[in-house]
């Protein structure tokens, strides 16, 4: 039984690690990194700044996922974020969870 539990814990840990590593790759694949970086403001805000601004907000994930897909303006300055029709709802939520985890 102990062996089964150990294998289960290791499997879950490995899958979680792979998912965490995949999110920067997804951000690159969906062209997020053309305007954003983790720590530095480019055209759009740094992901760490987004995470800080929305920390603790219950609706942050849904609000940001909608902005990823539909675009938005006025939150971070004069340059609007364009819509991203190439990003699915599931991908938007995956990306936003990763962005909100940046600290």
Segments predicted by a language model, with ranges:
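Sequence/structural segment immediately N-terminal to covalent heme-attachment motifs in c-type
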Residues: 21-38
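Post-signal/leader-peptide non-cytosolic segments of secretory proteins
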Residues: 57-66
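Bacterial N-terminal signal peptides that target proteins for export
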Residues: 1-8
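Repetitive helical segments and hydrophobic/amphipathic motifs
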Residues: 11-12
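Axial heme c-ligation environment in periplasmic c-type cytochrome domains
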Residues: 34, 42-54, 67-96
